[in-house]
């Protein structure tokens, strides 16, 4: 029997997580463990908690919320505390409410859950559902169907990537999708703002905000294809070295020494 560990960054009560658990329980004869944050941890990236203790709070059969933990905390502690004899065959992070594309991947708690898994040597996928602000209720039907297909492929054929690599998967908002595309991550155009105010005691405070976010116009990027109605799969590697720039930096350093 296969073993699956699930986490997310929207919190243990999120709709995307509930839909995913229901589908996996119905479609796969697998031992499923869920460890999710006790509250929403969107955009927490790959942060882990080192300054205070964490605790599992059981909310169901093999279902735990991690008291004030991040997605990376959830995966790390689950692998080290809940799995004594055998590690999971697959870690799934999601389904996130909102896309995780382009450089947003670096901010994403959803993607960080998958990153932590592959750092620990476990194959992982990150799942995110794109939606429009006008949508009152998200439709996860396509996301669940595609996720089922991908997981079945992993179990039947093995994980398609090398160590320390994961699949970042995004699902379009459209009810009828055009297909699945393997593509690169796009390039975000950021425009961050910070709104200041003063509390009743005269102390200034700030709210961080991301206003008018956009992407560079790239034909075959994840965000471009997602907007056209395709589900996107982007292989992500944790090797951050810019190999093509090494010679340039070496030459630059040598020039500075002369």
Curated annotation (Swiss-Prot):
It catalyses: a ribonucleoside 5'-phosphate + H2O = a ribonucleoside + phosphate. Its cofactor is a divalent metal cation. Its main location: cytoplasm. It is found in: Cytoplasm. The keyword Cytoplasm applies. Keywords: Cytoplasm, Hydrolase, Metal-binding, Nucleotide-binding. The keyword Metal-binding applies. Signal peptide: none annotated. Binds 1 divalent metal cation per subunit. A divalent metal cation binds at residues 9-10, 42, 96. GO terms for cellular component: cytoplasm. It is an enzyme of class 3 (hydrolase). SUPFAM superfamilies: SurE-like. GO terms for molecular function: 3'-nucleotidase activity; 5'-nucleotidase activity; exopolyphosphatase activity; metal ion binding; nucleotide binding. Its EC number is 3.1.3.5. Belongs to the SurE nucleotidase family. Nucleotidase that shows phosphatase activity on nucleoside 5'-monophosphates. NCBIfam families: PRK00346.1-4 (NF001490), PRK00346.2-4 (NF001494), surE (TIGR00087). This is 5'-nucleotidase SurE. It comes from Campylobacter jejuni subsp. jejuni serotype O:23/36 (strain 81-176). The lineage of its organism: Bacteria, Pseudomonadati, Campylobacterota, Epsilonproteobacteria, Campylobacterales. The gene is surE.
């Amino acid at each position: 029997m296969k073993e699956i560990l699930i986490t997310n960054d929207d919190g243990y009560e999120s709709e995307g997580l509930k839909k995913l658990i229901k589908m996996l329980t119905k479609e796969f004869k697998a031992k499923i463990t869920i460890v999710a944050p006790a509250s929403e941890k969107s955009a927490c990236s790959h942060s882990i908690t080192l300054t205070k203790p964490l605790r599992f709070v059981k909310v169901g059969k093999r279902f735990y919320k991690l008291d004030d933990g991040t997605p990376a905390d959830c995966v790390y502690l689950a692998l080290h505390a809940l799995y004594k004899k055998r590690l999971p065959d697959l870690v799934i992070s999601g389904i996130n409410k909102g896309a995780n594309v382009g450089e947003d991947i670096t901010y994403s708690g959803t993607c960080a859950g998958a990153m932590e898994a592959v750092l620990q040597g476990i194959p992982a996928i990150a799942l995110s559902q794109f939606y429009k602000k006008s949508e009152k209720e998200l439709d996860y039907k396509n996301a669940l169907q595609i996720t089922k297909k991908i997981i079945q492929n992993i179990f039947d054929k093995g994980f398609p990537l090398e160590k320390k690599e994961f699949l970042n998967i995004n699902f379009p908002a459209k009810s009828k999708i055009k297909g699945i595309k393997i593509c690169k991550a796009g390039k975000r155009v950021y425009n961050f703002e910070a709104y200041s105010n003063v509390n009743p005691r005269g102390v200034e405070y700030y709210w961080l905000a991301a206003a008018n976010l956009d992407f560079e116009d790239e034909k075959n990027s994840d965000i471009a294809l997602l907007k056209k109605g395709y589900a996107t799969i982007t292989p992500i590697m944790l090797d951050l070295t810019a190999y093509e720039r090494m010679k340039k930096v070496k030459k630059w350093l040598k020039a500075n020494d002369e």
